[in-house]
C-alpha cells in the first residue's frame, strides 16, 4: 500500500509504502489489530511472500473424444478416389492462482472508504470512525491510499475451462497417367477454442466495493493468515457476498482454419543412367490460412478502467492481473511449387573402387505469401556415398525460410505489464548514495507495447548435415550412425525486449541522448532534484516501452546426433532389440541486432555498469533450456506372446540466469554466478501379452506400463512451477493399463 501523504513522519511506519504481516514477525512499525501489523517498504520479506501456486492444478484434467472415417473407391484400374474425415474434441479443466493486481496498474482507495485505516476521524453523520487507527497525525479528513500488487486470496483460485473442437476433411484422387503417378486433393481443417476463466476480478467493480462507506465494503486490510502459514490461504476472508460484487467470468474465443489444394506428379524412371533410373517429382500447391482471437469485452478495450481516486490513471483492461489485448484476426494465401530429382550416379554393378553406390538428390521450392507480398525460393542438395557395403556417408545442404506468423503480422498492438528495473532512475539513486548499486534496483511495473507489421519479411536459414552410417557385416543387425549439423538463421522475427530497451536508454542518456522507444513522463520536482549533480538529464517515470516485432538478428547452432540400433540375432532366449540416441548441442550463438551491438559495446567499454546484464545474446549453450546432452535408450525383449520393454531418458544440466549469487565469484566462466539446474534421468517399464489363436480373442493385447518408475521429481529452478517445464516433466510415477483388439 502507498499512503498519499507528503510527510512520511505522519505515521509510525515512517514511510508512505507499507505492507501487512503477522505481528509475530520482526519489522513491525504499526499495529493493525487482530494479530497483524504494518511494515515499511514495498517488497515483502521472505517469511510473508505468498506461495503463488497454492491450490493450483499442475496438470490439467482432460477428457478427449476422437472419431475418424476413411473411404477409398476405385474409379478405374488406374485411378482411385479417397476421402478422410476426422473430429477431435478436448475438454480441459485446471485451477490457477488467485487474481492479483498488475504492478503497473495500482488501484486507488478513497480516504472515505469504510475500512481505510487512515480515513477521517468521523464517518458521515458525525459517528466516530471505528476503523481509523490511533497513533498517527494524518489530517482529520483522512488520506487516500494506493493498493499495489494485491492478491485476492479470499476470492479463491481461478477455474480455467478450455474446450477445443477440431475437424479435418481430405478428398482427392490418385493413380497413374501412363508412366506418371499423380495425387491431387483438397484439405480443409478448422479448429475452435473457447477459454472460460471464472473467479476473476473487475477493477471497476472492485474499486466500487472497496470505496463503499458502509460495512459491506471490501476490506483489503484484514490480513491473510496471521496465526497459520502467511504464505498460503486466507484465514480472515471477506464475506462471499462482498466478493461476489466484483467477481466476474472472463472468456476468450479463438480459431484457425486451413484450406489447401495441390497437384503432385512423380516418375521413378524418367530416363536411365549407368547408376540406375532417374526419378523426378513436382507439384503445385495453394493454401489459405485464417485465424481469429476474440477477447472478452473487459480485455479488448470495449470495457476499460478509469481510477476514480488517482487522477489520470486508466487501463485498457478492466480485469485485475491481465493486460489489455485487442481482438485480432488475419488471412494469408500462399502459392507454391516444388520440384525434386533423384540421380543414381553409381551402383554396385559398375565395380568402381571405393564407390559401391553414389546417389544425388536435388530439390527446390518457391512460395509467394500474398499478405506480406514476399516470395522465397529455396534449394536443397543431398548425397549418399556407400564406400563399401556397410560403410556409408551422407550429407545435405539446404536453404529454408519461415514466414512471420499471422499474429506477428496482424497484431494492432498488445500491452503487457512486466516488472522491470528502471536503470535510469536507479543510476541517479546510486550516484546520490541512495542505492548501493544497480543490482539493488527495485523492480517496478512497466507497460510494454508490442505490435505487428506487414513489413516483416520471412526468416532465412541455411543448413548443413554431414553423417556416416556403419552396418558391420561381422555383427549382423547392428547399425551405428553419427551426424553433424549446423543451422544458420537470419532475420529472426522477435522483439528487442523492454528490459534491453531500458538499458539502452541508460546508455544513451549517459552520452546525452535517449532511446525514443522508452516513453517517459515529464520529470517531477522531486525527480529533477534527484538527478541534480548526477551527470544525467532529469527523467520521469516510464509510461510505456515500444517493443514491436522486428526482423532482428541471426543465430547459429550446431551439434552432433548419434544413434545405435541393434537387433540381436536369435540365440534361443527370445528376441532382443536395443536402441540408443544421443544429441550433443555443441554451440548456440545468438548474434545481436544494431541496438544489441550498441549495448554490448557499451558494456565492453565500461560505459554501462557491470550490474546491467543483457539477456539472450552471445553463446547460449546450457542457458535456460539448452542442455549439452539429451539421451534416450531402450531395451526390448520378446518371446512368443510376451514383450518386456525398458526405456530411459536423460536430460542434461542447464544454468538458470534468473538466480544470481549474492556474493559474485570472479571467474572466467560467464555463467559461474548463475544457479546450476541439475540433470534428470527417467525410467519407464512396460509388460505386454498378445493373444494369438483361432478364437474371438485373437489379436487382443493387454499392456501394463509404469512411467517414471522411480518417481523422480524435476530438478529445482526459478520458474513458474519450480522447474523448467520445456525440459523436464513433473509427472510422478504413472501406471498405465491398455487393452487393444485388432479386428
Where are these regions (language model features)?
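Surface-exposed, low-complexity loop segments enriched in small/polar and acidic residues
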Residues: 4, 9-12, 16-62, 68, ...
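Residues that define the transmembrane beta-barrel architecture of outer-membrane proteins
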Residues: 61-65, 163-167, 257-259, 331-337, ...
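Residues on the lipid-exposed face of transmembrane beta-strands in outer-membrane beta-barrel proteins
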Residues: 69-73, 171-175, 261-267, 337-343, ...
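Short loop/turn motifs that connect adjacent beta-strands in outer-membrane beta-barrel proteins
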Residues: 76-79, 176-182, 270-278, 346-358, ...
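Transmembrane beta-strands of outer-membrane beta-barrel proteins
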Residues: 81-83, 182-184, 278-282, 337, ...
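Transmembrane beta-strands of outer-membrane beta-barrel pores
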Residues: 87-91, 177-179, 186-194, 269, ...
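C-terminal beta-signal and adjacent terminal beta-strands/loops
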Residues: 204, 479, 488-491, 586-587, ...
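C-terminal beta-barrel architecture of Gram-negative outer-membrane proteins
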Residues: 416, 574, 578, 582-695
Amino acid at each position: 500500500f502507498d499512503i498519499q501523504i507528503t510527510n512520511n513522519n505522519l505515521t509510525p511506519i515512517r514511510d508512505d509504502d507499507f505492507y501487512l504481516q503477522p505481528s509475530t514477525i520482526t519489522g513491525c512499525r504499526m499495529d493493525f489489530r487482530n494479530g497483524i501489523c504494518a511494515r515499511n517498504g514495498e517488497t515483502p520479506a521472505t517469511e510473508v511472500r505468498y506461495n503463488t501456486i497454492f491450490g493450483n492444478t499442475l496438470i490439467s484434467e482432460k477428457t478427449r473424444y476422437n472419431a475418424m472415417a476413411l473411404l477409398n473407391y476405385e474409379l478405374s484400374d488406374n485411378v482411385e478416389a479417397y476421402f478422410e474425415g476426422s473430429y477431435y474434441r478436448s475438454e480441459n479443466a485446471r485451477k490457477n492462482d488467485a487474481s492479483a493486481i498488475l504492478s503497473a496498474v495500482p488501484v486507488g482507495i478513497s480516504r472515505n472508504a469504510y475500512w481505510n485505516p487512515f480515513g477521517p476521524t468521523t464517518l458521515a453523520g458525525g459517528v466516530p470512525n471505528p476503523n481509523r487507527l490511533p497513533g498517527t497525525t494524518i489530517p482529520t479528513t483522512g488520506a487516500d491510499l494506493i493498493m499495489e500488487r494485491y492478491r485476492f486470496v479470499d476470492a479463491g483460485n481461478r477455474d480455467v475451462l478450455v474446450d477445443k473442437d477440431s475437424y479435418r476433411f481430405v478428398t482427392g484422387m490418385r493413380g497413374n497417367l501412363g508412366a506418371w503417378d499423380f495425387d491431387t486433393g483438397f484439405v480443409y481443417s478448422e479448429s475452435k477454442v473457447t477459454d472460460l476463466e471464472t473467479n476473476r476480478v473487475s477493477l471497476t467493480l472492485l474499486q466500487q466495493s472497496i470505496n463503499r462507506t458502509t460495512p459491506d465494503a471490501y476490506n483489503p486490510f484484514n490480513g491473510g493468515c496471521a496465526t497459520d502459514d502467511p504464505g498460503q490461504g486466507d484465514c480472515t476472508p471477506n464475506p462471499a457476498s462482498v466478493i461476489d460484487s466484483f467477481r466476474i467470468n472472463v472468456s476468450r474465443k479463438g480459431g484457425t482454419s486451413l484450406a489447401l489444394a495441390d497437384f503432385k506428379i512423380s516418375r521413378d524412371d524418367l530416363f536411365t543412367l549407368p547408376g540406375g533410373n532417374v526419378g523426378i517429382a513436382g507439384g503445385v500447391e495453394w493454401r489459405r490460412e485464417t485465424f481469429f482471437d476474440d477477447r472478452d469485452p473487459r480485455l479488448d478495450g470495449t470495457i476499460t478502467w478509469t481510477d476514480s481516486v488517482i487522477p489520470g490513471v486508466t487501463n485498457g483492461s478492466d480485469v485485475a492481473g491481465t493486460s489489455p489485448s485487442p481482438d485480432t484476426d488475419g488471412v494469408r494465401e500462399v502459392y507454391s511449387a516444388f520440384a525434386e530429382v533423384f540421380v543414381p550416379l553409381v551402383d554396385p554393378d559398375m565395380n568402381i573402387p571405393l564407390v559401391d553406390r553414389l546417389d544425388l538428390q536435388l530439390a527446390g521450392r518457391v512460395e509467394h505469401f500474398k499478405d506480406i507480398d514476399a516470395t522465397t525460393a529455396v534449394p536443397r542438395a543431398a548425397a549418399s556415398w556407400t564406400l563399401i557395403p556397410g560403410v556409408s556417408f551422407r550429407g545435405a545442404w539446404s536453404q529454408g525460410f519461415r514466414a512471420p506468423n499471422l499474429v506477428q503480422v496482424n497484431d494492432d498492438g498488445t500491452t503487457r505489464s512486466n516488472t522491470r528495473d528502471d536503470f535510469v532512475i536507479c543510476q541517479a539513486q546510486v550516484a546520490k548514495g541512495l542505492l548501493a548499486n544497480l543490482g539493488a534496483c527495485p523492480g517496478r511495473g512497466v507497460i510494454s507495447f508490442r505490435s505487428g507489421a506487414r513489413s516483416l519479411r520471412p526468416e532465412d536459414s541455411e543448413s548443413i548435415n554431414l553423417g556416416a552410417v556403419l552396418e558391420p557385416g561381422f555383427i549382423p543387425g547392428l547399425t551405428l550412425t553419427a551426424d553433424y549439423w549446423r543451422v544458420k538463421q537470419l532475420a529472426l522475427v522477435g522483439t528487442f525486449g523492454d528490459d534491453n530497451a531500458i538499458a539502452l536508454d541508460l546508455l544513451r542518456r549517459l552520452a546525452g541522448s535517449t532511446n525514443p522507444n522508452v516513453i517517459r513522463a515529464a520529470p517531477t520536482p522531486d525527480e529533477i532534484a534527484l538527478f541534480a549533480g548526477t551527470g544525467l538529464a532529469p527523467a520521469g517515470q516510464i509510461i510505456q516501452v515500444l517493443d514491436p516485432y522486428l526482423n532482428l538478428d541471426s543465430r547459429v547452432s550446431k551439434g552432433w546426433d548419434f544413434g545405435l540400433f541393434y537387433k540381436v540375432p536369435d540365440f534361443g532366449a527370445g528376441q532382443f532389440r536395443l536402441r540408443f540416441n544421443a544429441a550433443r548441442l555443441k554451440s548456440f550463438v545468438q548474434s545481436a541486432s544494431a541496438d544489441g551491438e550498441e549495448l554490448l559495446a557499451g558494456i565492453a567499454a565500461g560505459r554501462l555498469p557491470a550490474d546491467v546484464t543483457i539477456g539472450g545474446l552471445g553463446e547460449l549453450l546450457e542457458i535456460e533450456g539448452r542442455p549439452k546432452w539429451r539421451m534416450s535408450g531402450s531395451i526390448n525383449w520378446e518371446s512368443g506372446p510376451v514383450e518386456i520393454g525398458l526405456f530411459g531418458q536423460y536430460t542434461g544440466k542447464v544454468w538458470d540466469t534468473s538466480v544470481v549469487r549474492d556474493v559474485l565469484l570472479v571467474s572466467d566462466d560467464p555463467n559461474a554466478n548463475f544457479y546450476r539446474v541439475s540433470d534428470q534421468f527417467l525410467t519407464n517399464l512396460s509388460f505386454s501379452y498378445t493373444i494369438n489363436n483361432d478364437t474371438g480373442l485373437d489379436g487382443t493385447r493387454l499392456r501394463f506400463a509404469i512411467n517414471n518408475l522411480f518417481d523422480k521429481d524435476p530438478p529445482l529452478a526459478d520458474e513458474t512451477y519450480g522447474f523448467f517445464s520445456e525440459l523436464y516433466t513433473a509427472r510422478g510415477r504413472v501406471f498405465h493399463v491398455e487393452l487393444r483388439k485388432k479386428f
